[in-house]
């Protein structure tokens, strides 16, 4: 949480700084699938689709134009502009984003 004193908004710097940010501020794209499942279970599939669309649009643009084209990075900064970090191509990030996109499609 950004309110936690240990929160690290950006994944950068020396190894020790990146290690702190790894579990104290970065966004892990593969968790989007679990979050979408939870929203669908609690609020219903339509609510999950509505909530996922802006996130899917941003990740789709990243997939097509940034970093390793056709891939999604391992982590993203917790604060805007949410730059990718870690491994430039993470299979489980791509697979969960594609699964959520399929869930959100009409």
Q: Which residues fall in each region the model found?
A:
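Hydrophobic, well-ordered secondary-structure elements that form the walls
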Residues: 35, 39, 97
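Alpha-helical packing segments of well-folded alpha/beta enzyme cores
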Residues: 31-34, 55, 59
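Structural helix-adjacent loops and short alpha-helical linkers that scaffold large soluble proteins
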Residues: 39-54, 102-106
């Amino acid at each position: 949480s950004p309110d936690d004193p240990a929160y690290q908004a950006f994944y950068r710097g020396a190894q020790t700084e990146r290690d702190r940010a790894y579990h104290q501020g970065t966004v892990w794209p593969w968790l989007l699938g679990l979050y979408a499942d939870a929203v669908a279970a609690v609020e219903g599939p339509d609510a999950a689709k509505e909530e996922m669309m802006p996130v899917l649009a941003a990740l789709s643009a990243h997939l097509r134009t940034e970093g390793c084209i056709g891939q999604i990075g391992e982590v993203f900064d917790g604060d805007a502009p949410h730059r990718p970090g870690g491994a430039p191509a993470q299979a489980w990030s791509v697979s969960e984003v594609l699964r959520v996109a399929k869930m959100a499609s009409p």
